[in-house]
Amino acid sequence: MAVIKVSVISNNALNFDEDEHIYTRNDEEYTSVTTFIKKFFSEFDAEAVAEKKAYSYGKYSDKSKEEILDMWQQKADDGTEVHRLIEEWLRIKYNDEEFGDEPMPVKAIQGKEYWETNIEEDYFVHDVWPELQVYHDDYKLAGTIDVAFKHNSKGKTAKRQVSLIDWKTNK
């Protein structure tokens, strides 16, 4: 198996344009890993799928195409907000700060509880890097990992192990 060395950003050397989903480093454009992976799959045609599901069956039996598209957009927005809150909570938790008064949605609370009961207890976490940016100069690829953490051999894995988490908020 070939090993590809990936660099990790420790400063602001990598910039990300969220709207265009493009990374730049030293004025060079890098393809996001998400964009790269999309090349291997057919594009999801939300309009056509919503049209087909409208007034069909199950949870869509009483929904129009527009209502379905709105529902999907709301779920995407909710997922983005959950990611933001979990990221903020992790940054605060590992820097001994307080979270504040902002209420957390149920899925963010579930992510927090999962972290506290499954990750911290089982893996003996040392370092945590939420929204960790990585890149490869030769391939001009870059991406952001939802959270990476270093843990030791007292847990389920070997010493100096790093694990990566990709938060999902779907059912």
State what each model feature region is.
Residues 2-15, 20, 67-164, 170-171:
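Catalytic cores of nuclease domains that cleave nucleic-acid phosphodiester backbones
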Residues 1-81:
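Charged, glycine-rich intrinsically disordered N-terminal tails and low-complexity linkers that flank
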